[in-house]
Curated annotation (Swiss-Prot):
Cofactor field: Mg(2+)
PTM text: Activated by phosphorylation.
InterPro entries tied to this protein: A-D-PHexomutase_a/b/a-I (IPR005844), A-D-PHexomutase_a/b/a-I/II/III (IPR016055), A-D-PHexomutase_a/b/a-II (IPR005845), A-D-PHexomutase_a/b/a-III (IPR005846), A-D-PHexomutase_C (IPR005843), A-D-PHexomutase_C_sf (IPR036900), Alpha-D-phosphohexomutase_SF (IPR005841), GlmM_bact (IPR006352)
Lineage: Bacteria, Bacillati, Bacillota, Clostridia, Natranaerobiales
E.C. code: 5.4.2.10
Name of the protein: Phosphoglucosamine mutase
Cross-referenced NCBIfam families: glmM, PRK10887.1
HAMAP family: GlmM_B
Length: 442
């Protein structure tokens, strides 16, 4: 059987790649692994139309090996991680494909400390798929409980207790991407007194991430300016990413958010080892800004799992990705868009500065990211011609530029990132590399 788990759980087109039959098997196999840590598993989902179907299958699989299933309903991925670490449970499961297109869905698991399962543990689950597993009967069969919204309220209240901010002087635009934050984010910020302008804050799984959210924050940007808001937050479909918009509608991406938070945490003596963990996709401007602050930047491969693993290895508390995954181990074990928004608001209040002023800490070098759709990622990545052209472009860009070419871990695309001083040149070289990659993948 081919490897099932990718860089962020199991993903595919729902009812085609990720079928109910497969989810049932995954539930049984994951349940066999998790039940040595407890008798209950939390299960959440985003708003995707396939979510209830896959939730039913996964829950049935978990119950069939004797586990009790506590259904959270529509909830963010970080809320599942948070609750898995707080409740007396074996772990948690989230049914979501994050920022992926509408037809996709996925399943990822968390242990009872709230961390995504390590690759070795996912391999154990895959091994269980091939084995005959226990089939309890009678009163030993697990139960699938009705949805429990109280646990979500517990999550919201714990965030408020940790950050009891007075936001009554702030007007905030919230883009919930028709996804999992559509209830949680508006409810939390309203409870703290903010005036909220919600966008895409409905349970519309057929439109999740479509021209909205953290990957498409343009409407949020315009709305901030038109409504005279102080700032805006755009989340992705499962709520683990955030892109902020300042009072003039300018994007404040993950790099700038990390710079703002790192400076604030260092000033409080909370930035362990004065170090931040980010990926190779982060802008060179982040490294330069942190150097001025006496903060070291260590880079990893792309993926929030890689960031988290390095954070734990290096005993760091802050890390993330340019895309808006921000991990702060003081508060949660995975990227949490709503929590990151709260932390940004705290810095605004404490400093009395606007988001634009705070974001000026970092000057970005022009950077261009192109997603090249291909049918064969391996042939493109391993192509000698692609590597030769990449080297030529790197020489052309010089010491203040760089090129990254890598396969997506979740989509059939090759990501090309070029960075340098001249945007026109970047477009030229990106277009050139795109054509070379497409030809190599034929």
């Amino acid at each position: 059987m081919p490897k099932l788990f990718g860089t962020d759980g199991v993903r595919g087109v729902a009812n085609e790649d990720l079928t109910p039959e497969l989810c049932l098997k995954i539930g049984r196999a994951a349940g066999e692994y998790l039940k040595s840590y407890g008798d209950t598993v939390l299960v959440g989902r985003d708003t995707r139309l396939s979510g209830t179907m896959l939730e039913a299958a996964l829950s049935a699989g978990l119950a069939s090996v004797g586990l009790k299933v506590e259904r959270l309903g529509i909830v963010t991925t970080p809320a599942v991680a948070f609750l898995a670490s707080r409740e007396d449970v074996a772990g948690g499961a989230m049914i979501s494909a994050s920022h992926n297109p509408v037809p996709d869905n996925g399943v990822k698991f968390f242990d009872n400390k709230g961390y995504k399962l390590a690759e070795s543990h996912e391999e154990q689950i895959e091994n269980y798929l091939e084995k005959e597993l226990s089939r309890p009967t009678g009163t030993d069969i697990g139960k699938v409980l009705p949805e429990n919204n109280k646990l979500i309220e517990n999550y919201i209240q714990e965030l408020i207790d940790k950050y009891p901010l007075d936001l009554s002087n702030y007007k905030i635009v919230l883009d919930c991407a028709y996804g999992a934050t559509y209830q949680i984010a508006p409810r939390l910020f309203k409870k703290l007194g903010a005036e909220i302008i919600p966008l895409h804050a409905e349970n519309r799984g057929e439109k999740i991430n479509v021209e909205c959210g953290s990957t498409n924050p343009e409407l949020t940007s315009r709305t901030v300016v038109e409504e005279g808001a102080d700032l805006g937050f755009s989340f992705d479909g499962d709520g683990d990413r955030i892109i902020a918009l300042d009072e003039e509608g300018n994007q404040v991406n993950g790099d700038k958010i990390m710079a703002i938070l790192a400076k604030d945490m260092k000033s409080r003596g909370e930035l362990k080892n004065d170090k931040l963990i980010a990926t190779v996709m982060s802008n060179l401007g982040l490294k330069l800004a942190l150097k001025e602050l006496g903060i070291a930047l260590e880079e990893t491969k792309v993926g929030d799992r890689n960031v988290l693993n390095r954070m734990r290895e290096q005993d760091c508390v802050l890390g993330g990705e340019q895309s808006g995954h921000i991990i702060n181990l003081q508060d949660n074990t995975t990227g949490d868009g709503v929590l990151t928004g709260l932390k940004l608001m705290k810095v605004l209040i404490d400093t009395g500065q606007s988001l634009k002023q705070l974001a000026s800490i970092m000057e970005e070098l022009p950077q261009l990211l192109v997603n090249v759709k291909v049918s064969n990622k391996d042939s493109a990545i391993n192509s000698q011609k692609v590597q030769e052209e990449k080297s030529k472009v790197e020489k052309q860009l010089g010491s203040k530029g760089r090129v990254l070419i890598r396969p997506s871990g979740t989509e059939p695309v090759i990501r090309v990132m070029v960075e340098g001083e001249n945007r026109e040149t970047l477009h030229e070289v990106a277009n050139h590399l795109t054509q070379v990659i497409k030809k190599a993948a034929e």
